[in-house]
From Swiss-Prot:
Cellular component per GO, a single term: nucleosome
Family matches, as PROSITE patterns: HISTONE_H2B (PS00357)
Any GO MF annotation of the entry: DNA binding
Protein name per Swiss-Prot or TrEMBL: Histone H2B
Listed Basic residues bias regions: 7-21
Coiled-coil regions listed in the entry: none
Residues covered by region (Disordered): 1-21
Cross-link (Glycyl lysine isopeptide (Lys-Gly) (interchain with G-Cter in ubiquitin)): 109
Keyword DNA-binding: yes
Family matches, as PANTHER family: HISTONE H2B
Subcellular location: Nucleus; Chromosome
Record function comment: Core component of nucleosome. Nucleosomes wrap and compact DNA into chromatin, limiting DNA accessibility to the cellular machineries which require DNA as a template. Histones thereby play a central role in transcription regulation, DNA repair, DNA replication and chromosomal stability. DNA accessibility is regulated via a complex set of post-translational modifications of histones, also called histone code, and nucleosome remodeling.
Protein's gene: H2B1
């Protein structure tokens, strides 16, 4: 049975109400870190986009590696230990040490609050 004009009008009205989906970015956090390190330096939209893509890529790789570790160990729960190991596997030397220490600090701060 074809849609009645009233139903069609209602559907068109509902379609008009759809809003553009908001995309989450790390721009605010990238900017905060930039200002902590170099207060006098700015960043272009293109550079911010590249940094955002980089962070999304790294987080995706860490999540993928951590999920593999969970499966290898025949576990069902992803814990901070798997994430920490994934970071150690993916990031080189000193960068991994700093990432692990900052991550541990963040988890401690979160659990204590």
């Amino acid at each position: 049975m074809p849609a009645t004009p009233a139903k069609r009008a209602k559907r068109v009205q509902q379609e008009k109400r759809h809003h553009k989906k908001r995309t989450e970015t790390f721009s605010v956090y990238i900017y905060r870190v930039l200002k902590q390190v170099h207060p006098e330096t700015g960043v272009s939209k293109k550079s911010m986009s590249i940094m955002n893509s980089f962070i999304n890529d790294i987080f995706e790789k860490i999540a993928l590696e951590a999920s593999k570790l969970v499966r290898y160990n025949k576990k069902h729960t992803l814990s901070s230990r798997e994430v920490q190991t994934a970071v150690r596997l993916l990031l080189p030397g000193e960068l991994a040490k700093h990432a692990v220490s900052e991550g541990t600090k963040a988890v401690t701060k979160y659990t204590s609050s």
